[in-house]
Amino acid sequence: MLDPSTAGPLTDAPASSLRSILVHVDATTESATRLLVACDLAERHRATVRALFGTAPMADTGSFGYSAGAALDDATALRSLRLEQARAHLQRSLGDRAPDVAWYDVVGETVGHGFLQEAVFADLVVLGQQSASVGRNGGAPAGFVELVAMEGGRPTLVIPHVLSTDAVGRRVLIAWNGSAQAARSVSGALPLLHAADEVHAVTWGRGPSIAPFSRLDIRQHLAGHGIAVTTHQRAPSAHVGEDLIAVAQALGSDLIVMGCYGHGRATERVLGGATRSILRKMTVPVLMVH
């Protein structure tokens, strides 16, 4: 039984409230877009924003005649320089919002593990889409998005390279297939779904209930949360990722909510086909949970 003397204060915040956002920033120009999205969401949901700077390990700065210590000193100095340059650039991009962001650096940990340690205290984490040049020019290390999405256990919002607006979540599209991953993603997205102007759900094959013996479907489930959903049924497809992007474009969606599918191995994480396709070809932000 709870001891009333140790219980926290009661609040009127809903159980699905969004109060803490962690965003990954690095030395790439796309970091500003991620931060602006995070700040816009924070303003709408009265949340705090923490920006965690982390890049792939610096390229080997040693050369013939360099000692290991000198090379390490050079790499540390380069990292510090990149951090200060990135922070100055991002603060200029944020303008009046800059004082509201708490800034951190990954120290003494790999970027992935350092970020995962901070992510456990976030209601939402914000990452950037990775490209073929991943890890170069001050970006995140290879496999960073997969690591956070599959092992972080938090709703993960991935922002595409090119984004026309920082107002994300006005028109939301849910990719629904009745899986545990899709259900966790919908639960993680509830604060955004509550605040959205429109919510759509797309299914492939059977329709919104998916499970043949289910007494509920996604419309009824979200109606119980006070969220109205328009459903769309598509024919079964071998290219669900591409089809999902096409549906999002046709509806004018600015956010896709979907499960993150894949499995981890000892040294790598293998994404499912639809998840991999979306992360490569995404044109709007995607919120996912493994």
Question: What are these model-derived regions, one by one?
Answer:
Residues 127-147, 169, 259-280:
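Glycine-rich, Arg-bearing micro-motifs that act as flexible, cationic patches
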